[in-house]
A protein has these predicted regions:
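Alpha-helix capping at helix-to-loop junctions
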Residues: 13, 30-34, 59
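Bateman/CBS regulatory modules and CBS-like beta-alpha motifs in cytosolic regions of diverse proteins
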Residues: 1-26, 38-39, 44-45, 65-79, ...
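A conserved regulatory-domain signal marking ACT and ACT-like small-molecule sensing domains
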Residues: 54-143
């Protein structure tokens, strides 16, 4: 009979409980592991798994609340561009749930989760020359 002690790892990667989520993700990706023990003052206090990270992503992205996800490509980057976009949305009585700025080789993209389901109103409001409206979609429409 093979026992757990015969096959267990003894040099295990860990993360501190107060570490950033991104740090845990980096360790898990670098080590190709799906579970990471969480430590506090040299004591095991829990684990974080891939599913925990997926859940956190859904929460952070605002997906769980449903609404509209807008993707903009910034065409004229300048100081205050996010403030300009936020003001346009606020003036139209639309609430921003989350904003993610993604700097890619093909440009700067801003993804905004809005607390509305009115895709046509969003399209009508976001018309500045400072950005291109790439996509407007409803989120959390499955299940």
């Amino acid at each position: 009979k093979t026992k757990v002690g015969d096959v267990m790892l003894t040099h295990v990667a860990t993360i501190e409980a107060d570490a950033l989520l991104e740090d845990a993700i980096k360790v898990m990706r670098t080590k190709s592991i799906g579970v990471l023990p969480v430590m506090e003052k040299n004591q095991l206090v829990g684990i974080i798994t891939n599913n925990d990270i997926f859940d956190a992503f859904l929460k952070i992205s605002g997906y769980e609340n449903g609404g509209v996800r807008v993707t903009l490509k910034i065409t004229k980057e300048h100081h205050g561009i996010l403030a300009v976009i936020a003001k346009e949305l606020a003036d139209a009585q639309m609430n921003i749930e989350t904003i993610v700025v993604n700097r890619l080789s093909k440009g700067i993209f801003v993804e905004i989760q809005l607390a509305t389901k009115d895709t046509e109103k969003v399209k009508a409001v976001l018309t500045s020359d400072d950005y291109e409206l790439v996509d407007v979609v409803l989120t959390n429409t499955i299940m």
